[in-house]
Amino acid sequence: ELPKSIAKSSDIAVNGVPFKCDIGKFNSTTFNYVAAFGAFTDVPYDTPQETKNILGHTAYVLEGMKRLSSLPSYHVKIKYDNGEFEGDIFLCMILNATSVAGLHKTKQLKNVDLNDGLFEMLVFKRPTNLIEFQNILINLMRGENSGDEYLFVKSSYFEFECDENIKWTLDGE
């Protein structure tokens, strides 16, 4: 994690020790942080920087809460090492990160290895009511590995099928 001080961060950029990390391939583009689609993927970009500076993680939560009534739904088929998933989801993230959109205290992301040849996938199944949405957040924060609300897997590849065009967001390309 980089220090908040510009001087200290600059020093790391100039004098820091390089390290190897996994690089993902998304069609003809590469990325090393996250590839995502669905609800909230634009929240980090649409939330005003001043709000993020003042409220931190809470800024993401507040912006996301404004959108709960209009969650999208995607019927997808996903193949990955040792398995596949088919169902209706509202958010999917392919990650090589220990923190994304303020999620950093989850058991799953604490154990991410940035140089193991694997990416992590979080797929959030579409809730039908606010209680199900709350259960997603509770189980994710508890570190439950997978369940009725979401799926967390590590894999060397992910292959997606969907009947509609999906707008992916790549970060770290």
Question: What feature does the model see in each segment?
Answer:
Residues 2-94:
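Catalytic core of DAGKc-family lipid kinases
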Residues 20, 27, 72, 88, ...:
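A generic structural signal for well-ordered coil/turn residues at beta-strand boundaries
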Residues 51-58, 99-103, 107-128:
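Gly/Ser/Thr-rich active-site loops/lids in small-molecule metabolic enzymes
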Residues 80-82, 86, 113-116, 123-173:
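ATP/nucleoside-binding phosphotransfer catalytic cores, i.e., glycine-rich phosphate-binding loops
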